[in-house]
Swiss-Prot record:
This is Ankyrin repeat-containing protein C105.02c. PROSITE patterns: ANK_REP_REGION (PS50297), ANK_REPEAT (PS50088). One of its GO terms (molecular function) is protein sequestering activity. Keywords: ANK repeat, Cytoplasm, Nucleus, Repeat. It is found in: Cytoplasm; Nucleus. Gene3D superfamilies: Ankyrin repeat-containing domain. The keyword S-adenosyl-L-methionine does not apply. Its main location: cytoplasm. Residues 150-170 are annotated as: Disordered. GO terms for biological process: endocytosis.
Length: 170
């Protein structure tokens, strides 16, 4: 693929699409200022960011490289469908189950939210074909689902109250 005359953002997307880590690194390191903003703001012609493109094309090495960068947005939504990178990773099962599962695991390890729905109201797990549901369901469980309940947890700082674990009785 020729990148001659291409804009840096186009080269970045091309690197993600073709799983070319060397090109990805080179383009990001050539940018002045905040590389994270450059990565998060680059889009393909359909409005997909770098993480979306990696998961759409099964670009494991580029995805791994991007996920090592603090601040890369894991939960951006595709402008057309509302799909997150986790949705794209799950849909990759049609091409390669092993790669799809690995991408889901990678995204979950760094905090992608499996509870986000796309424009049709589907979570990533809802898009998994029945034959693979159990395998992907366990991969999509992780620290992120617990976050939805964290607001329901109430701290009890009053050690005098019943149920505090301390007792005046002996």
């Amino acid at each position: 693929m020729s990148t001659e005359g291409a804009k840096p953002s186009e080269m970045l997307i091309a690197a993600c699409r073709s799983n070319n880590v060397d090109m990805l690194e080179e383009v990001v390191h050539q940018q002045e200022g905040d590389g994270v903003s450059f990565i998060n703001n680059a889009r393909d012609s359909l409005g997909n960011d770098c993480v979306h493109v990696c998961t759409k094309y099964g670009s494991l090495e580029c995805l791994d490289w991007l996920l090592d960068i603090s601040g890369v947005n894991l939960n951006n939504r595709c402008r057309m469908t509302g799909d997150t990178p986790l949705h794209f990773a799950v849909m990759f099962i049609k091409k390669d189950q092993e790669t799809a599962l690995r991408m889901v695991e990678m995204l979950m390890e760094v905090g992608a939210d499996p509870l986000l729905t796309n424009n049709d109201g589907f979570r990533p797990i809802d898009l998994v074909p029945g034959d693979f549901h159990d395998v992907f369901a366990s991969a999509l469980e992780g620290p992120a689902p617990a976050l939805q309940y964290s607001a329901d947890v109430v701290a009890d700082d009053d050690d005098e109250e019943e149920g505090s674990g301390e007792s005046d009785e002996e």
